Design a protein with these regions (language model features):
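Blade-level signature of beta-propeller repeat domains, shared across WD40, Kelch, NHL, RCC1
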Residues: 275-311
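A short beta-strand motif characteristic of beta-propeller blades
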Residues: 12-14, 55-58, 97-101, 138-143, ...
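Conserved strand-to-loop turn within each blade of WD40 beta-propeller repeats
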Residues: 37-40, 81-85, 123-126, 164-167, ...
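WD40-repeat beta-propellers
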Residues: 43-48, 88-92, 129-133, 170-174, ...
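WD40/WD-repeat beta-propeller blade N-cap
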Residues: 15-22, 59-66, 102-108, 143-149, ...
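A short helix->beta-strand "capping" segment at the edge of beta-propeller domains
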Residues: 2-19
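Loop/turn segments within WD40 beta-propeller blades
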Residues: 25-31, 70-76, 112-117, 153-159, ...
Length: 311
């Protein structure tokens, strides 16, 4: 089967702005802005133009690493950041100003919006989940788990909530009650990351066993696995049509596979372990960031975007 996209003809561009390594990259809902969160305690918002030029604005205020960030799914200029300083902040990407702040109980490492934009879920290093009401920016639900909780996600309709765990399971909870519905024995080692396919048919899970599994959301059954990586899978993302999945780890490449066949269609070479990959919601542009160092062994503070027709 011929692939629809000639990946081999596409190029990556590099964006420099942070003083230390970038932990997280995320696109806004219109695909026009990309945010990057860094160990340098800042986030930056980049206005990416179709030919790849960018203007950026700095979001300053956190006093520890910005570990993950996510955009309001209904508002192209509102972004939430999670930091090791125990706060979660809401920002206006036009002004660069922090509009809301919530002080939570631990070092925050995971954050995700409910698809309707009303709630934000935050996970911390102590395996505690906090749900914030976005309007008041106050916690409406807190739950501590007795096992390691990694990346978290809602399904497209917002009535199911997924937790990836250190036990190799995916816990499926009914939302908003957070009532356990299912435990999926997904992998032989810890599950680190999860992505929901934009068509709503599938979700994918990346694991320490180096595999990515693809699950049918209505049946809760594993459809196939992607086996190209050899190291623990740190980050995964579906493209906007749901036809391709990108996955990355400490392997020195990002794998892009066809979701329907399971076959690799392209590999993007990397110079370091990757922390975050995310496809643009409107175009086949893949942002990625990792532990890149310069020749003096200092963090480069860069991210890249793959998918441009010229370098």
């Amino acid at each position: 089967m011929e692939e629809k996209i000639a990946f081999k003809n596409l190029h990556s561009r590099e964006y420099q702005g942070h003083k230390k390594k970038v932990h997280s990259v995320a696109w806004n809902c219109t695909g026009t802005k990309l945010a990057s969160g860094s160990v340098d305690q800042t986030a930056r918002v980049w206005h990416i133009e179709p030919h790849g030029h960018a203007k950026d604005i700095e979001l300053k205020g956190h006093t520890d690493s910005v570990d993950q960030l996510c955009w309001d799914p209904k508002h192209a200029d509102l972004i939430a950041t999670a930091s090791g300083d125990k706060t979660v902040r809401l920002w206006d990407a036009r002004s660069g100003k922090c509009s809301q702040q919530a002080e939570l109980s631990g070092e925050n490492i995971n954050i995700t919006y409910k698809p309707d934009g009303t709630h934000v879920a935050v996970g911390n290093r102590d395996d505690e989940l906090t749900i914030l009401d976005v309007r008041k920016f106050k916690p409406i639900h807190r739950r501590k788990f007795s096992y390691e909780v990694n990346e978290i996600a809602w399904n497209m309709t917002g009535d199911m909530f997924f937790l990836t765990t250190g036990n190799g399971t995916v816990e499926v909870l009914a939302y908003p009650l957070l009532r356990p519905v299912d435990t999926l024995m997904a992998h032989t080692a810890g599950c680190y990351c999860i992505a929901i396919d934009p068509t709503g048919r599938y979700f994918a899970v990346g694991s320490a066993d180096s595999l990515v599994s693809l699950w049918d959301i209505s049946e809760m059954l594993c459809v196939r696995t992607f086996t190209k990586l050899e190291w623990p899978v740190r980050t995964i993302s579906f493209n906007y049509t749901g036809d391709y999945i990108a996955s990355a780890s400490e392997d020195l490449f990002i794998d892009i596979s066809n979701v329907h066949t399971g076959r690799t269609v392209h590999q993007i070479p990397c110079r370091a372990a990757m922390n975050s990959v995310e496809w643009n919601p409107k175009y086949n542009l893949l942002a990625y960031a990792g532990d890149d160092k310069n020749k003096y062994s200092a963090d480069e503070g860069v991210f890249r975007i793959f998918g441009f027709e010229s370098s």
